[in-house]
Amino acid sequence: YAGLDIGGTVARMKIEYADGRAGEFYGAGGTMNTDGYEKCNAKYRSFILPILEEAQIKAEDCVKICVAASGIDSPRQEEECRRSFLEMGFRPESILVYNDCEVFLHVSTGPAIVLVCGTGSIAYARGESGAITRCGGWGHVLSDEGSGHNMGMKVIREAANHIDGRTRCPILYELFEAQSGLKTLDEINTFVNDMLMEKTQIASFAPLAEKAYELGDETGLKILRECRDELFALVKDVYYKADLDR
């Protein structure tokens, strides 16, 4: 048996072998709705196939494999994800594919809300009738409020505004400059545009908000509070969308 949790930045795989042993492995993640099939397929294969080879097991021998992947937002993307695992040798009847947030709703029965926030953000809910609804998770351009990418962009904006003389956040700026090596607005602008679809690179600056606050920069706290409020709004929206207020 195998289970995969594939986020935008990190992928995790757990395997239970026939003799009862278990193994856990980590690799690079990917998001189907923004990275696309070709890129995600390459990441899936480079992560999973070496694990199978090292363990001397065949994909076709897997009884069940549950894939909870970021960016599985439509039947087409679900089918593309399934195709990737079929091409690796897993049997059609052994493959289960879910959005990485939706899968948590299957842990219990009855009304529930799940919020997942990593590189991106998404909320799912199951109402009294059993119907499943979602809010958010439509990529870093349309949504992903409060996420690692969103927080990372806020850090970059505040650092840019500090250079531009529009705000003062010297500690946050120094942390950003030390990590990025970027010193001018032109350099920052070029970096952001070059990394527009590389969410992991932008999200890597998110921890600087907390570090800056711990060192006495109130701008760091402002960013943390903004992301907190955005995540709360996401939960509130899916709560009402699922009619859980009735």
What are these regions (language model features)?
Residues 72-169:
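Phosphate-binding/catalytic loop of phosphoryl-transfer enzymes
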Residues 1-62, 84-87, 108-113, 157-246:
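ATP-binding/phosphotransfer module of carbohydrate and carboxylate kinases, centering on a glycine-rich
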Residues 69:
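Short glycine-centered, acidic/aromatic-flanked micro-motifs in structured strand/loop junctions
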Residues 66:
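Short aromatic/hydrophobic contact patches that present stacked aromatics
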